[in-house]
């Protein structure tokens, strides 16, 4: 068993807490935990048996920045499709680890489709529904044996919507005998943690190395998630997957995920994240990837694309031009980032500012690598540009947007130069 260490004291400066030391888990070409950068993952919502549709969506998620993608494997057709999906992705030059999401019948599917077991980079196992009664231990062991045979990592993911009822009943019974019983919420959290951690220790007993195990214990409530992961992090050294089980739709889902995950990440807890957004009608599935990246970037965990600071607007900024320019700049740097990642590494750390008036515009622009202070209502029709804190040029006229974009591109080419060798 892992001996929990004392929770570290918060840093005195503005940095995040030190990362929690965990096992490093190799998932395909990605390493989760062990001090490596927090990994962004996502999940498809296609019928996995629809090979063309699944390949298309995995490719979209990968291009958006997802570093691992999970797919439902719930029947023989979806299990048989996995090797073909991997093959087609590789033909497109896409090497992204695919995770098989198993519930109820994973042991049967991998027995029937060993090529699926080989093609997947990781198996997700839910200890709450891997089996029931006397079959539970046997079916869990079968899945772990597949992971050992094919040298695959697993995520043992407990979920409050599919909690191990036998364990929950046991803990409720134990709680009733306490001199001071816990409230129901605390018992539920304990059941989630015990389900995940005890299952992981059982997997180790069966022969799966600790560095092949990732844990999660998901709920939908922000405070509950924070409490569960703080407690679980203190009890084990397994890599942890963070995420609300159902974050919700639109801004609610984004805010809930940010509220929960940012607290844990700031405390050094979490090795991979997924933002479980409910897509709005017509919205791309890639939104969850973008939100995950922005969450990690705004909390200082990673850098994916230049960070654009923009004025929110007020009565001094009756023109919408600064809003339009902020959107143009954001879209431009996101579109250029795949190219810059290869030719201009480090450009993702660049900061940009698009401000709308003289009050905070010049000051905020000086804090950025490149900033522009547009004129507010009644101000002179000119826009000073600041580069690394120094005013360099003043833009005027109808081509401000094009000229500012050109200045950004020039700065990238001049500042972020790939070193030979």
Curated annotation (Swiss-Prot):
Top-rank taxon: Bacteria
Cofactor: [4Fe-4S] cluster
Amino-acid positions noted as binding [4Fe-4S] cluster in the UniProt annotation, renumbered to this chain: 311, 314, 357, 364
Pathway: Isoprenoid biosynthesis; isopentenyl diphosphate biosynthesis via DXP pathway; isopentenyl diphosphate from 1-deoxy-D-xylulose 5-phosphate: step 5/6
Gene3D superfamilies documented for this protein: Dihydropteroate synthase-like, Sulfite Reductase Hemoprotein, domain 1
Record note on cofactor: Binds 1 [4Fe-4S] cluster.
Catalytic activity: (2E)-4-hydroxy-3-methylbut-2-enyl diphosphate + oxidized [flavodoxin] + H2O + 2 H(+) = 2-C-methyl-D-erythritol 2,4-cyclic diphosphate + reduced [flavodoxin]
Keyword Iron-sulfur appears in the UniProt entry: yes
Enzyme Commission number: 1.17.7.3
Annotated Pfam families: GcpE
InterPro entries per the UniProt record, alphabetical: Dihydropteroate_synth-like_sf (IPR011005), IspG_bac (IPR016425), IspG_bac-typ (IPR004588), NO2/SO3_Rdtase_4Fe4S_sf (IPR045854)
GO MF annotations in UniProt: 4 iron, 4 sulfur cluster binding; 4-hydroxy-3-methylbut-2-en-1-yl diphosphate synthase activity (ferredoxin); 4-hydroxy-3-methylbut-2-enyl-diphosphate synthase activity (flavodoxin); iron ion binding
Enzyme class, spelled out: oxidoreductase
Gene Ontology biological process terms from the UniProt entry: isopentenyl diphosphate biosynthetic process, methylerythritol 4-phosphate pathway; terpenoid biosynthetic process
Family, per entry: Belongs to the IspG family.
Biological function: Converts 2C-methyl-D-erythritol 2,4-cyclodiphosphate (ME-2,4cPP) into 1-hydroxy-2-methyl-2-(E)-butenyl 4-diphosphate.
Protein's name in the database: 4-hydroxy-3-methylbut-2-en-1-yl diphosphate synthase (flavodoxin)
Phylogenetic lineage: Bacteria, Pseudomonadati, Pseudomonadota, Gammaproteobacteria, Lysobacterales
Protein encoded by which gene: ispG
